Amino acid sequence: LIVNTLFSKDVIKYHDYLKILIKNNFKCREKNETVLYFTSVNKVRIILSGSMALDKKITYPKNVDYLILAYQGRSDLDKKIVNIIKVIKPKNIILTHFDNSFPPISKNVNISNLRNVIPSNIGLIIPEYEKEIVL
């Protein structure tokens, strides 16, 4: 995945943007950890995850109403999301970053099979450009 990204045509196309991404990656770190925010609004429990990496030593909130998940950056996304669902047990998942949001280090992710991977009792919300999501 890393080699494919480094040698993709997007590296040339977005080389100026890549410099900014690399600089901000080092500048905007939060203790060199993956960030996961948990909040509650009017009894609606929400997790905002900046990554699909979960630490086995951490106890995460469970049975949340919404998991906002960055779905990007791995070659085993389907396998990884199944593990996240087992750990967090969300009622609904809102995908982010499944599009080419940070070229050249991101790419468009094929999400067409995702509904087959996620249990049917879990809502899957795929945001659309300029369309409001009502929770």
Which role fits each region the language model picked out?
Residues 54, 77-83:
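Alpha-helical scaffolding within the catalytic cores
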Residues 50-52, 71-73, 98-99:
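Active-site metal-binding loops of divalent metal-dependent hydrolases
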Residues 27-30, 75, 108:
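Conserved phosphate-coordination/catalytic loops
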Residues 60-61, 82, 88-135:
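Binuclear metal-ion centers of metallo-dependent hydrolases, dominated by the metallo-beta-lactamase
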Residues 1-62, 131-135:
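Core dinuclear metal-dependent hydrolase active-site scaffold
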Residues 75-78, 104:
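Loop/helix-junction capping segments adjacent to catalytic residues or to phosphate/diphosphate-binding pockets
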Residues 63-70:
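Active-site beta-loop-alpha substructure in enzyme catalytic cores
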Residues 44-46, 66, 92:
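Structural motif
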